[in-house]
């Protein structure tokens, strides 16, 4: 399963990837806004928004890019490992 994580904390980026790997998922993590998001996102099975650490502009931009993709979008206000773990249990578990 491929996962894209948007938002979150910079210091947790590696931990997000390791946790996804433990669920046998490939993860891409974008903490900061990046240009050309559509090309970098690919076609993920699950997209996770950590909304507390994302600007509204980044959320809207990402949603526009994901309209044409067949992906599940999960929004979470907190960007903790336990929040990510519960999302992964629900979708990849």
Predicted regions and their residues:
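Short glycine-/small-residue-rich Rossmann-like dinucleotide-binding loops
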Residues: 52-53
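An anion/phosphate-binding loop that grips the pyrophosphate of nucleotide cofactors and donors
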Residues: 44
């Amino acid at each position: 399963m491929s996962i894209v994580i948007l938002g979150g904390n910079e210091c947790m980026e590696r931990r997000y990837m390791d946790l996804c790997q433990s669920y046998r998922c490939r993860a891409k993590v974008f903490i900061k806004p990046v240009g050309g998001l559509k090309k970098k996102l690919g076609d993920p099975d699950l997209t996770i928004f950590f909304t507390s650490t994302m600007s509204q502009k980044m959320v809207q931009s990402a949603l526009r890019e994901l309209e044409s993709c067949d992906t599940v979008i999960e929004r979470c206000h907190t960007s903790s490992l336990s929040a990510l773990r519960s999302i992964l249990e629900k979708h990849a578990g």
